[in-house]
């Protein structure tokens, strides 16, 4: 029974899984991104541009893929992501997610009030 449940859970998760990227290749590809998000991905050039360092790789893959497909709208990011291959997106996510981040985490208790 446990084995069947595990197989079922893995089958459900597989559409959301991604192969992972090459952080070294992502570092090379990130130079264009750093122009707006900052060289360390913690110091964007404007307050309305997000800090990305340390962000979860699955979030970064989803966001870039959505910009590329047009599901998420932003004229700058749509153009930038449109030029990326699926492997480029994986590589960038692997690199950026591995950087030390300054993301603000909201405690769950504050969200549930």
Language-model features: where?
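Gly/Gly-Pro-rich "capping" loops immediately C-terminal to redox-active cysteine motifs
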Residues: 23, 41-69, 78-83
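Flexible coil segments in periplasmic/lumen-exposed cytochrome c-class electron-transfer proteins
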Residues: 20-31, 39, 72-113
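Cleavable N-terminal signal peptides
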Residues: 6-7, 17
């Amino acid at each position: 029974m446990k084995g069947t449940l595990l197989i079922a859970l893995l089958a459900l998760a597989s559409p959301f899984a991604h192969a992972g990227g090459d952080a070294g290749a992502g570092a090379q590809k990130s130079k264009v991104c750093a122009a707006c998000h900052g060289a360390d991905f913690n110091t964007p050039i404007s307050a309305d541009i997000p800090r990305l360092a340390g962000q979860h790789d699955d979030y970064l893959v989803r966001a870039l893929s959505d910009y590329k497909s047009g599901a998420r709208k932003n004229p700058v990011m749509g153009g930038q992501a449109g030029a990326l291959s699926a492997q480029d997106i994986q590589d960038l996510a692997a690199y950026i997610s591995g950087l030390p981040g300054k993301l603000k985490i909201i405690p769950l208790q504050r969200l549930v009030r």
